[in-house]
């Protein structure tokens, strides 16, 4: 007689699309909300491949016996590295950044992802959206805002109806109790009391949520293709540990972003918005290569964790290049 609990078999077969592990579903996942993406770099010197540098560095460190052809190639790499002015390193590396078509808080607001009685959260949310988005909220109906966001006329689903009810209630205005005091607030009042004045939505790196049974690297490549319109075979994934960005968002939920590092194969590739790419057209407003300083300054000041990802990567690449350059010079003197 089989006395095994059937629920345990179900748990073993279940798959969490959040953390990518078996044994539970995403609603029961204890991990932060996970997105996976790629930070793609461009090195503004021809014939410098970061994966090759990392590989050769390990071989030199491990006293690998190089062939004559490999030594000739190493000498060519040294000649290229000798042209690099590390005092101008900030302009040597460029990073591929994307700008959201709509700010994250605006999307959450239109989707009704808030407690209408949570005044503190609503104040933060309205503060983090752009000036243009505030004007749209102030001057347009919910039907218009919904269609403008999603690019379709699907106004019959449950999320639309629930979000519409919340929006119209906020438009009309309502009283809530805060610290035992009845406070009146409305959309107009929230907009009037905003402090920040952002001109454009957030800039960041291509990333997104996992599909069912999708591995981390598969998710990262798919999201990269959808958001940049650059095929993943046009980049090389660098043999580096993925970087992580973990933070507590304004909705009090914990998020974790995992970024693989990649190098573009052809420096002449110009990123652009492709109107035939529906995923990109709906989600992405702009895309471009940026120097380290420009990228660091365009990321919103409160996105400290994202700035740290960029800074740590930038310093790490510099260390890899400098360390290889020094060890290569010492090695070639012995040949």
Predicted regions and their residues:
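Nudix hydrolase/Nudix homology domain
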Residues: 2-15, 27, 123-129, 137, ...
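Core residues of folded domains in eukaryotic genome-function proteins
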Residues: 12, 34, 94, 201, ...
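Voltage-sensor-like transmembrane helices and their cytoplasmic interface
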Residues: 17, 223-226, 288
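Cys/His-coordinated zinc-binding microdomains
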Residues: 20, 30
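Cys/His-rich microdomains that often coordinate metals
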Residues: 23-24
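N-terminal strand-loop-strand
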Residues: 32-206
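Active-site micro-motifs of SAM-dependent methyltransferase domains
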Residues: 103-105, 226, 297
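The catalytic Nudix box helix
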Residues: 199, 204-241
């Amino acid at each position: 007689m089989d006395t095994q609990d059937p629920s345990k078999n179900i748990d073993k077969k279940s798959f969490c699309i959040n953390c990518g592990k078996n044994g539970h579903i995403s609603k029961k996942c204890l991990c932060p909300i996970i997105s996976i993406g790629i930070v793609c770099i461009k090195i503004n010197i021809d014939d410098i491949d970061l994966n090759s540098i990392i590989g050769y560095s390990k071989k030199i460190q491990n006293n690998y016996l190089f062939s004559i052809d490999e030594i000739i190639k190493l000498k060519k790499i040294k000649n290229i590295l000798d042209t690099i002015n590390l005092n101008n390193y900030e302009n040597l590396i460029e990073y591929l950044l994307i700008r959201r078509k709509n700010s994250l808080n605006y999307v959450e607001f239109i989707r009704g992802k808030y407690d209408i009685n949570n005044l503190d959260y609503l104040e933060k949310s309205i503060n983090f959206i752009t000036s243009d988005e505030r004007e749209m909220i102030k001057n347009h109906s919910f039907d218009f805002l919904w269609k403008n966001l999603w690019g379709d006329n699907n106004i019959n689903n449950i999320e639309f109806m629930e979000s519409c009810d919340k929006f119209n209630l906020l438009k009309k205005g309502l009283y809530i109790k805060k610290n035992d005091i009845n406070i009146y607030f409305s959309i107009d009042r929230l907009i009037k009391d905003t402090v920040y004045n952002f001109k454009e939505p957030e800039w960041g790196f291509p990333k997104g949520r996992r599909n069912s049974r999708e591995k981390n690297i598969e998710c990262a490549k798919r999201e990269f293709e959808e958001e940049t319109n650059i095929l993943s075979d046009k980049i090389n994934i660098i043999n580096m540990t993925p970087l992580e960005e973990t933070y507590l968002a304004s909705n009090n939920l914990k998020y974790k972003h995992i970024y693989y590092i990649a190098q573009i194969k052809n420096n002449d590739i110009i990123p652009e918005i492709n109107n035939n790419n529906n995923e990109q057209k709906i989600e992405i407003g702009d895309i471009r290569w940026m120097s380290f300083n420009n990228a660091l300054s365009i990321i919103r000041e409160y996105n400290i964790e994202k700035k740290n990802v960029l800074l740590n990567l930038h310093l790490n690449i510099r260390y890899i290049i400098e360390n290889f350059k020094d060890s290569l010079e010492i090695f070639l003197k012995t040949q």
